[in-house]
Amino acid sequence: MPTITVIVPTLNEVENIDLLLKRVLSTRQSCSIDFDILFVDSASTDGTCDRVLDWQEREPVHLLRLDTNMGLAGAVIAGARYTSSKYILVMDADLSHPPEVIPKLLRPLLEGTDDMVIGSRYVEGGSIPDWPFSRKLFSRIATLPALIFCGVKDPLAGFFAVERRKLTELSDSVPGFKIGLAILAEYGKDLRVTEIPIEFRDRDFGESKMNYWVVFDYLKQLLSLVFKRVGRKG
Protein backbone atom coordinates (compact mmCIF):
# COMPACT_ATOMS: atom_id res chain seq x y z
CA MET A 1 0.00 0.00 0.00
CA PRO A 2 1.30 3.51 -0.78
CA THR A 3 2.75 5.61 2.02
CA ILE A 4 0.36 8.44 1.14
CA THR A 5 -3.41 8.65 0.80
CA VAL A 6 -5.21 11.62 -0.70
CA ILE A 7 -8.52 11.99 1.16
CA VAL A 8 -11.37 13.68 -0.70
CA PRO A 9 -14.57 14.23 1.34
CA THR A 10 -17.68 14.23 -0.85
CA LEU A 11 -21.33 15.14 -0.59
CA ASN A 12 -23.19 15.16 -3.92
CA GLU A 13 -20.16 15.85 -6.12
CA VAL A 14 -20.92 13.54 -9.07
CA GLU A 15 -20.30 16.30 -11.62
CA ASN A 16 -16.76 16.84 -10.37
CA ILE A 17 -15.48 13.28 -9.87
CA ASP A 18 -14.27 12.65 -13.43
CA LEU A 19 -12.67 16.09 -13.79
CA LEU A 20 -10.93 15.80 -10.44
CA LEU A 21 -9.60 12.28 -10.94
CA LYS A 22 -8.25 13.00 -14.41
CA ARG A 23 -6.13 15.82 -13.01
CA VAL A 24 -5.13 14.02 -9.80
CA LEU A 25 -4.10 10.86 -11.64
CA SER A 26 -2.26 12.87 -14.29
CA THR A 27 -0.31 14.55 -11.50
CA ARG A 28 0.40 11.18 -9.90
CA GLN A 29 1.73 9.82 -13.17
CA SER A 30 3.98 12.81 -13.85
CA CYS A 31 5.62 12.96 -10.42
CA SER A 32 7.77 10.42 -8.61
CA ILE A 33 5.43 10.15 -5.62
CA ASP A 34 3.10 7.18 -5.26
CA PHE A 35 -0.26 7.70 -3.57
CA ASP A 36 -3.80 6.39 -3.63
CA ILE A 37 -7.06 8.33 -3.46
CA LEU A 38 -9.76 7.72 -0.87
CA PHE A 39 -13.17 9.30 -1.30
CA VAL A 40 -15.06 9.57 1.99
CA ASP A 41 -18.70 10.05 1.10
CA SER A 42 -21.27 11.49 3.49
CA ALA A 43 -24.44 9.82 2.18
CA SER A 44 -24.57 11.40 -1.29
CA THR A 45 -27.80 10.98 -3.24
CA ASP A 46 -26.68 12.05 -6.71
CA GLY A 47 -24.64 9.05 -7.89
CA THR A 48 -21.29 10.19 -6.51
CA CYS A 49 -20.52 6.76 -5.04
CA ASP A 50 -21.33 4.92 -8.27
CA ARG A 51 -19.02 7.23 -10.20
CA VAL A 52 -16.18 6.63 -7.75
CA LEU A 53 -16.74 2.87 -7.91
CA ASP A 54 -16.37 3.02 -11.70
CA TRP A 55 -12.90 4.50 -11.25
CA GLN A 56 -12.06 2.07 -8.45
CA GLU A 57 -12.18 -0.81 -10.92
CA ARG A 58 -9.17 0.49 -12.88
CA GLU A 59 -7.24 3.02 -10.77
CA PRO A 60 -5.83 3.33 -7.20
CA VAL A 61 -9.12 4.84 -6.08
CA HIS A 62 -11.13 3.73 -3.04
CA LEU A 63 -14.46 4.60 -1.48
CA LEU A 64 -15.50 4.81 2.17
CA ARG A 65 -19.25 5.30 2.55
CA LEU A 66 -20.56 6.92 5.71
CA ASP A 67 -24.14 6.31 6.76
CA THR A 68 -24.69 9.92 7.79
CA ASN A 69 -23.28 13.36 7.06
CA MET A 70 -20.55 13.74 9.69
CA GLY A 71 -19.35 17.07 8.35
CA LEU A 72 -16.07 17.58 6.56
CA ALA A 73 -13.97 17.26 9.71
CA GLY A 74 -15.67 14.03 10.73
CA ALA A 75 -15.29 12.61 7.23
CA VAL A 76 -11.57 13.37 7.12
CA ILE A 77 -10.96 11.81 10.53
CA ALA A 78 -12.96 8.73 9.52
CA GLY A 79 -10.89 8.44 6.35
CA ALA A 80 -7.62 8.79 8.25
CA ARG A 81 -8.65 5.98 10.59
CA TYR A 82 -9.76 3.82 7.68
CA THR A 83 -6.45 3.91 5.84
CA SER A 84 -3.05 2.82 7.13
CA SER A 85 -0.89 5.22 5.11
CA LYS A 86 1.73 7.22 6.98
CA TYR A 87 0.76 10.54 5.40
CA ILE A 88 -2.56 12.11 4.46
CA LEU A 89 -3.29 14.87 1.98
CA VAL A 90 -6.74 16.47 2.24
CA MET A 91 -8.38 18.30 -0.64
CA ASP A 92 -11.84 19.33 -1.84
CA ALA A 93 -13.67 17.52 -4.61
CA ASP A 94 -14.79 20.65 -6.44
CA LEU A 95 -11.39 21.54 -7.99
CA SER A 96 -11.00 24.68 -5.91
CA HIS A 97 -7.68 23.13 -4.85
CA PRO A 98 -5.30 22.60 -7.80
CA PRO A 99 -4.26 18.91 -7.98
CA GLU A 100 -1.04 19.90 -9.74
CA VAL A 101 0.27 21.27 -6.41
CA ILE A 102 -0.02 17.88 -4.66
CA PRO A 103 3.71 17.01 -5.05
CA LYS A 104 4.75 20.35 -3.52
CA LEU A 105 2.63 19.63 -0.45
CA LEU A 106 3.97 16.10 -0.04
CA ARG A 107 7.72 16.49 -0.60
CA PRO A 108 8.52 18.39 2.64
CA LEU A 109 6.81 15.62 4.64
CA LEU A 110 8.67 12.89 2.80
CA GLU A 111 11.97 14.73 3.23
CA GLY A 112 11.30 15.19 6.95
CA THR A 113 11.61 18.98 6.93
CA ASP A 114 8.00 19.73 7.93
CA ASP A 115 5.11 18.17 9.86
CA MET A 116 2.32 19.93 7.96
CA VAL A 117 2.23 21.63 4.57
CA ILE A 118 -0.65 23.94 3.66
CA GLY A 119 -1.84 25.06 0.25
CA SER A 120 -2.25 28.72 1.09
CA ARG A 121 -4.27 31.50 -0.51
CA TYR A 122 -2.58 34.23 1.49
CA VAL A 123 1.17 33.75 1.22
CA GLU A 124 3.08 35.54 -1.54
CA GLY A 125 2.13 33.96 -4.86
CA GLY A 126 -1.26 32.71 -3.63
CA SER A 127 -4.48 34.12 -5.05
CA ILE A 128 -8.27 33.88 -5.24
CA PRO A 129 -8.99 35.27 -8.72
CA ASP A 130 -12.71 34.45 -8.78
CA TRP A 131 -13.63 36.29 -5.59
CA PRO A 132 -14.85 39.90 -5.46
CA PHE A 133 -13.17 42.27 -3.01
CA SER A 134 -16.04 41.99 -0.51
CA ARG A 135 -15.69 38.22 -0.24
CA LYS A 136 -11.91 38.43 0.08
CA LEU A 137 -12.35 40.97 2.87
CA PHE A 138 -14.86 38.77 4.69
CA SER A 139 -12.51 35.79 4.40
CA ARG A 140 -9.63 37.79 5.85
CA ILE A 141 -11.77 39.00 8.75
CA ALA A 142 -12.99 35.45 9.43
CA THR A 143 -9.36 34.30 9.52
CA LEU A 144 -8.29 36.77 12.21
CA PRO A 145 -9.68 34.92 15.28
CA ALA A 146 -8.04 31.69 14.12
CA LEU A 147 -4.62 33.37 14.13
CA ILE A 148 -4.74 33.25 17.93
CA PHE A 149 -4.10 29.51 17.78
CA CYS A 150 -1.34 29.39 15.17
CA GLY A 151 1.19 31.43 13.25
CA VAL A 152 0.24 30.66 9.67
CA LYS A 153 -1.38 33.04 7.20
CA ASP A 154 -4.14 30.72 6.01
CA PRO A 155 -5.21 28.61 9.02
CA LEU A 156 -8.62 27.92 7.47
CA ALA A 157 -7.21 26.27 4.36
CA GLY A 158 -8.73 22.91 3.53
CA PHE A 159 -5.85 21.80 1.30
CA PHE A 160 -3.01 20.36 3.36
CA ALA A 161 -0.76 17.36 3.95
CA VAL A 162 0.10 15.95 7.36
CA GLU A 163 1.18 12.77 9.14
CA ARG A 164 -1.85 10.51 9.55
CA ARG A 165 -1.57 10.18 13.32
CA LYS A 166 -2.05 13.94 13.68
CA LEU A 167 -5.58 13.33 12.39
CA THR A 168 -6.35 10.04 14.11
CA GLU A 169 -5.46 11.51 17.51
CA LEU A 170 -8.04 14.29 17.18
CA SER A 171 -11.38 14.07 18.96
CA ASP A 172 -14.35 12.64 17.08
CA SER A 173 -16.27 15.78 17.97
CA VAL A 174 -14.28 18.28 15.88
CA PRO A 175 -17.07 20.44 14.44
CA GLY A 176 -17.59 21.82 10.97
CA PHE A 177 -15.21 22.21 8.08
CA LYS A 178 -11.96 23.54 9.55
CA ILE A 179 -10.06 20.34 10.22
CA GLY A 180 -6.73 22.01 9.41
CA LEU A 181 -7.31 24.59 12.14
CA ALA A 182 -8.02 21.79 14.61
CA ILE A 183 -4.60 20.26 13.86
CA LEU A 184 -2.80 23.61 14.13
CA ALA A 185 -4.48 24.37 17.45
CA GLU A 186 -3.92 20.88 18.90
CA TYR A 187 -0.18 20.68 18.22
CA GLY A 188 0.66 24.38 18.45
CA LYS A 189 4.20 25.66 18.16
CA ASP A 190 5.67 22.16 18.18
CA LEU A 191 4.30 21.65 14.65
CA ARG A 192 6.67 22.53 11.82
CA VAL A 193 4.44 24.14 9.19
CA THR A 194 5.12 25.42 5.68
CA GLU A 195 2.65 27.23 3.42
CA ILE A 196 2.78 26.73 -0.35
CA PRO A 197 1.03 29.34 -2.53
CA ILE A 198 -1.97 28.16 -4.53
CA GLU A 199 -4.52 29.68 -6.87
CA PHE A 200 -7.86 28.94 -5.25
CA ARG A 201 -10.71 28.72 -7.77
CA ASP A 202 -14.47 28.69 -7.31
CA ARG A 203 -16.29 25.53 -8.36
CA ASP A 204 -17.78 25.29 -11.86
CA PHE A 205 -20.14 22.40 -11.09
CA GLY A 206 -22.31 21.35 -8.18
CA GLU A 207 -23.53 23.36 -5.22
CA SER A 208 -21.31 25.08 -2.70
CA LYS A 209 -21.47 23.68 0.83
CA MET A 210 -20.98 27.15 2.31
CA ASN A 211 -24.02 28.27 4.28
CA TYR A 212 -25.01 29.72 7.65
CA TRP A 213 -24.51 26.34 9.34
CA VAL A 214 -20.87 26.32 8.20
CA VAL A 215 -20.38 29.76 9.76
CA PHE A 216 -22.10 28.57 12.95
CA ASP A 217 -19.88 25.48 13.13
CA TYR A 218 -16.78 27.66 12.66
CA LEU A 219 -17.82 29.93 15.54
CA LYS A 220 -18.55 26.86 17.67
CA GLN A 221 -15.11 25.50 16.84
CA LEU A 222 -13.44 28.77 17.82
CA LEU A 223 -15.24 28.77 21.18
CA SER A 224 -14.25 25.15 21.75
CA LEU A 225 -10.61 25.98 21.07
CA VAL A 226 -10.75 28.97 23.43
CA PHE A 227 -12.18 26.86 26.27
CA LYS A 228 -9.61 24.15 25.60
CA ARG A 229 -6.75 26.62 25.76
CA VAL A 230 -8.08 28.21 28.97
CA GLY A 231 -8.41 24.73 30.47
CA ARG A 232 -4.80 23.93 29.65
CA LYS A 233 -3.58 27.14 31.27
CA GLY A 234 -5.74 26.47 34.32
Residue ranges of model-derived segments:
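Conserved donor nucleotide-binding strand/loop of the catalytic core
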Residues: 35-38, 49-82
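Cell-envelope/extracellular polymer assembly enzymes that use nucleotide-activated donors
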Residues: 3-5, 36, 182
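Catalytic donor-sugar/metal-binding loop of nucleotide-sugar-dependent glycosyltransferases
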Residues: 172-175, 184-201
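N-proximal low-complexity "stem/linker" segments adjacent to membrane-targeting elements
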Residues: 1-26
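Acceptor/aglycone-binding surface of glycosyltransferases and processive sugar-polymer synthases
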Residues: 66-82, 87, 99-177, 203-216, ...
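A conserved acidic beta->alpha catalytic loop
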Residues: 41-50, 95
